[in-house]
Amino acid sequence: MAEPDYIEDDNPELIRPQKLINPVKTSRNHQDLHRELLMNQKRGLAPQNKPELQKVMEKRKRDQVIKQKEEEAQKKKSDLEIELLKRQQKLEQLELEKQKLQEEQENAPEFVKVKGNLRRTGQEVAQAQES
């Protein structure tokens, strides 16, 4: 490569160009990564050498192991968690029953509602007379 002619001239008015800093080479993380990739390539552990099927199988195995660990963690619930789940289920059942009763009352014919109101007023009048 030819040397630029401004290097030979000792003109003090010229600003000498400085070599640009390569951020990739100065980055310590990038150097470590590059060194690791070179070592893996020499050993034959390069990720590009694996066939696609093998990559997919390894990913499935990893996913399976993770799923098994999560299931085991769920199975190992403490007594407190079990009791809380039971209470939550009971509360949900009570809410469902209340909703069913409300729906039945809303869907009931008008004469059934009036009959219930008459009974209540009759009972209230009877209690007021007894007092």
Swiss-Prot record:
Modified positions (N6-acetyllysine) are 50
Q: Where is this region: Disordered?
A: 39-78, 100-131
Looking at the keywords, is Acetylation present? Answer: yes
Database matches in InterPro entries: FAM107
Q: Name one Pfam family in it.
A: DUF1151
Q: Which keywords belong to this entry?
A: Acetylation, Coiled coil
Family per record = Belongs to the FAM107 family.
According to UniProt, the name of this protein is Protein FAM107B
Lineage from the top down? Eukaryota, Metazoa, Chordata, Craniata, Vertebrata
